Curated annotation (Swiss-Prot):
Protein name: UDP-glycosyltransferase 74E2
Keyword Glycosyltransferase: yes
Organism field: Arabidopsis thaliana (Mouse-ear cress)
Family membership: Belongs to the UDP-glycosyltransferase family.
Sequence positions that bind an anthocyanidin: 17
């Protein structure tokens, strides 16, 4: 490999973006590339090496002073992040050149398209990384091109559009930023602007795999130089070729982990409902009470991740009342939980990272989406990949306890449950094949690496 096989990687400063891009770095490092992972932080520290010696983490400031609230104004936040990155990169690139390892490209998050011009200004290639699936990006693309009119509300149920290789969609299946544009005008602009200069990028990377979006892939490849490199799940849960890649980089050795795993070890195979809604979804108190009642009345064992800031919404004396039927924790080792034989289904918000984890580990899912791309992911989870069901919400989005119970029984029992489990196992195998030697994503990663060797 030639000198200078060195890339700068710049994720958007959010865990759902940092995780897949840092996992991609591990795959690239295993192929011989050197990576500098630039992380925007409110408390930047000196650069440091990861477990893999070829990856250097380079924290930089988000542009806010101590005591300032960074997310009070999204436009202000994005502007300061952009300024901080543009002020930092010249010296970083120059230092790399002086060290004898000049960068060849910048791999940047799709929500920061201005980095393409920054890369080209330094004579570097620009590779955009989409942390969302093509099924979502395609919708944003049609909005960007003006070929799709944004509906005024998400609560309509008439068919609105059919995009290339898509099932028919209703407003309730679209990303929330489209149907509630007046509530999220700044975010809508950001997600649509992901496509603003995609026709000029050198390579387009996506955290998905070919078989998962096979029909849609033909369409996007006719437009752009696309390489699917997912799923970006740690290797030891998939192909097992990278023995050190066991987690996303967080310590798993604490009392809460032991509590989770010991509790699961005491349960029969496929008997536990696992619930987690990610790090951002906030349930209203009435929805939390209804969900708690549905779980209790289902009679099923359940492991529920409830953030410490949300526990006050649980019913009074709930933990005592459920006894051994349920375990409520503030955090869980999600990959270990999903891989555990006792898990019968995953009740999820259908964020893309969680959806990919469920698919990769062969776990049937119950989708309870809230915002962003979650409704679209849930639509495909149920109707295209057929690995679960989506709860039926009322007009205002509220989900009744009876619907929670019905969905759990549908996935855990009966003929439909068996078919769902069979499909989940199929996608698990296909995900493993994609990242294994000679698989579609492995070939894509090799092709990407060869551009800089």
């Amino acid at each position: 490999m030639r000198e200078g096989s060195h890339l700068i990687v710049l994720p958007f400063p959010g865990q759902g973006h940092i995780t897949p891009m840092s996992q991609f770095c591990k795959r690239l490092a295993s192929k011989g590339l050197k990576l500098t992972l630039v992380l925007v932080s409110d408390k930047p520290s000196p650069p440091y090496k990861t477990e893999h010696d070829s990856i250097t983490v380079f924290p930089i400031s988000n542009g806010f002073q101590e005591g300032e609230e960074p997310l009070q104004d999204l436009d202000d936040y994005m502007e300061r992040v952009e300024t901080s990155i543009k002020n930092t990169l010249p010296k970083l690139v120059e230092d790399m050149k002086l060290s004898g390892n000049p960068p060849r490209a910048i791999v940047y998050d799709s929500t920061m398209p201005w980095l393409l011009d920054v890369a080209h200004s330094y004579g570097l290639s620009g590779a955009v990384f989409f942390t969302q699936p093509w099924l979502v990006t395609a919708i944003y693309y049609h909005v960007f091109k003006g070929s799709f009119s944004v509906p005024s509300t998400k609560y309509g149920h008439s068919t609105l559009a059919s995009f290339p290789s898509f099932p028919m969609l209703t407003a309730n299946d679209l990303p929330s930023f489209l149907c509630e544009s007046s509530s999220y005008p700044n975010i809508l602009r950001i997600v649509v602007d992901q496509l603003s200069n995609i026709d000029r990028v050198d390579i387009v990377l996506c955290n998905t795999f070919d078989k998962l979006e096979e029909k849609l892939l033909k369409w996007v490849q006719s437009l752009w130089p696309v390489l699917n490199i997912g799923p970006t799940v740690p290797s030891m849960y998939l192909d097992k070729r990278l023995s050190e890649d066991k987690n996303y980089g967080f310590s798993l050795f604490n009392a809460k982990v032991a509590e989770c795993m010991e509790w699961l070890n005491s349960k029969e195979p496929n008997s536990v409902v696992y619930l987690s809604f990610g790090s951002l979804v906030i349930l209203k108190e009435d929805q939390m009470l209804e969900l708690a009642a549905g779980l209790k009345q289902s009679g099923r064992f359940f492991l529920w991740v409830v953030r410490e800031t949300e526990t006050h919404k649980l019913p009074r004396n709930y933990v005592e009342e459920i006894g051994e039927k349920g375990l409520i924790v503030s955090w869980s080792p999600q990959l270990d939980v999903l891989a555990h034989k006792s898990i019968g289904c995953f009740l999820t918000h259908c964020g893309w990272n969680s959806t990919l984890e469920g698919l990769s580990l062969g776990v049937p899912m119950i989708g309870m989406p809230h915002w962003t791309d979650q409704p679209t992911n849930a639509k495909f989870m149920q109707d295209v990949w057929k690995v679960g069901v989506r709860v039926k919400a009322e007009g205002d989005g509220f989900v009744r306890r009876e619907e929670i119970m019905r969905s759990v029984e549908e996935v855990m029992e009966g003929e439909k449950g068996k078919e769902i489990r069979k499909n989940a196992e199929k996608w698990k195998v296909l995900a493993q094949e994609a990242v294994s030697e000679g698989g579609s994503s492995d070939k894509s990663i090799n092709e990407f690496v060869s551009m800089f060797c």
